[in-house]
């Protein structure tokens, strides 16, 4: 059902309609976004008169450079309308048609933005989990994922090794640190990617922080300039309102909120009697393979996770990625307890909601029409 890209769009739009309906009935307090991607637009009143096409950049660019370098390191900062946009601009700027983009990940597969950008650049693409493997001789760009969509984190020694391998071959390194810029540094005590020698690093300002959905890139000034040039060419750069919100989010970032998630996770797991869960740095995931009552139904793991996610949303107001994520995003049922809403949801309420979702889906998983309506509307 979800292999069809059109159905992926229908699935997401159905979930957004459910959120809209719940907002009308219960207001924002009836929604608990546990995706870790809820973002925010923390503008101050004084910012509103400045978010114009030309005035905005004149005011906020200097602040962006200062706050961005403090968060990411590097010589220069650039802002993009999404992390995927930043990756696309970097691949277009730094690769040659026919060359190879070589991608290291803690766990396969890649976020679709990396192979997709490579295809648009008419370059070849290879990915590996082996951080000792050397890239092919025709490699023009090495990409390293600092933390996967399911929060698998690269070890600092592996990251350093890959950077050294690439630099020995004269290849620039881009670290996709979408959530890793905070996970790696705050919870694992790792250094910032640019401090480890990465030429470029990019993070999402809505992941594990309260900023807007946007991409913040740091790195060597000469490369940032090339990437920015390509971004302007294709309209990938962040606009003034987004840049202003990024600046405020960076200024307000509080690492302790991520650390508090560990306490919430421990409280949840202590009395949870449901299916087997797998811990993540800031929460937990439920894999469809652990849901024995739902196996053998003819539905694959992605569809089962999405069905559960839809019930959690429609019945309990709990937002998770399988329901609302962009087409192609991971369908792992992940609960991020570092999310802003995690601070106001009762842990017992979350447990009971999960039990209820499993029970309801078990009751009609053999009814194809009900499953289709549940997932696609």
From Swiss-Prot:
The modification N6-(pyridoxal phosphate)lysine is found at residue 207. Pfam families: SelA, UPF0425_C. GO terms for molecular function: L-seryl-tRNA(Sec) selenium transferase activity. InterPro entries: PyrdxlP-dep_transferase_arc (IPR020033), PyrdxlP-dep_Trfase (IPR015424), PyrdxlP-dep_Trfase_major (IPR015421), SelA-like (IPR018319), UPF0425_MJ0158-like_C (IPR055177). Its cofactor is pyridoxal 5'-phosphate. Coiled coil: none annotated. The keyword Signal does not apply. It comes from the Archaea. Keywords: Pyridoxal phosphate. Disulfide bonds: none annotated. PANTHER family: L-SERYL-TRNA(SEC) SELENIUM TRANSFERASE (PTHR32328:SF0). Belongs to the UPF0425 family. NCBIfam families: pyridox_MJ0158. This is UPF0425 pyridoxal phosphate-dependent protein MTH_1914. It comes from Methanothermobacter thermautotrophicus (strain ATCC 29096 / DSM 1053 / JCM 10044 / NBRC 100330 / Delta H).
């Amino acid at each position: 059902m979800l292999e069809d890209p059109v159905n992926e769009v229908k699935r997401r739009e159905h979930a957004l309609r459910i959120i809209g309906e719940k907002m009308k009935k219960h207001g924002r307090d009836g929604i608990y976004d546990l995706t870790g991607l809820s973002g925010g637009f923390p503008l101050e009143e004084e910012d509103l008169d400045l978010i114009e096409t030309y005035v905005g950049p004149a005011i906020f660019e200097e602040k962006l450079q200062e706050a961005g370098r403090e968060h990411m390191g590097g010589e220069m900062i650039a802002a993009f309308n999404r992390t995927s946009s930043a990756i696309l601009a970097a691949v277009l700027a730094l690769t040659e048609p026919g060359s190879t983009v070589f991608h290291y990940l803690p766990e396969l597969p890649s976020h679709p933005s990396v192979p997709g950008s490579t295809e648009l650049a008419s370059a070849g693409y290879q990915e590996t989990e082996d951080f000792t493997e050397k890239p092919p001789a025709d490699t023009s760009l090495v990409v390293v994922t600092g933390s996967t969509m399911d929060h698998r984190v690269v070890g600092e020694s592996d990251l350093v090794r890959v950077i050294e391998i690439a630099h020995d071959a004269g290849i620039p390194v881009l670290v996709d640190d979408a959530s890793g810029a905070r996970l790696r540094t705050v919870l694992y005590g790792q250094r910032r990617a640019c401090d480890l020698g990465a030429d470029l690093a990019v993070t999402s300002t809505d992941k594990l922080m309260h900023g807007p959905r946007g991409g913040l890139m740091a790195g060597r000034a000469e490369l940032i300039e090339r990437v920015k040039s390509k971004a302007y060419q294709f309209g990938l750069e962040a606009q003034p309102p987004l840049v202003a919100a990024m600046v405020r989010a960076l200024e307000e970032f509080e690492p302790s909120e991520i650390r508090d998630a560990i306490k919430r996770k421990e409280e949840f797991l202590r009395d949870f009697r449901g299916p087997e869960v797998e811990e993540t740095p800031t929460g937990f995931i439920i894999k469809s393979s652990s849901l024995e009552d739902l196996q053998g139904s003819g539905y694959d793991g992605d569809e089962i996770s999405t069905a559960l996610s839809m019930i959690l949303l429609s019945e309990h107001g709990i937002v998770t990625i399988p329901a609302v994520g962009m087409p192609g995003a991971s369908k792992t049922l992940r609960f991020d307890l570092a999310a802003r809403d995690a601070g106001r949801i009762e842990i017992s309420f979350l447990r009971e909601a999960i039990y209820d979702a499993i029970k309801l889906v078990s009751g009609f998983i053999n009814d194809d029409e009900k499953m289709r309506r549940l997932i696609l509307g």
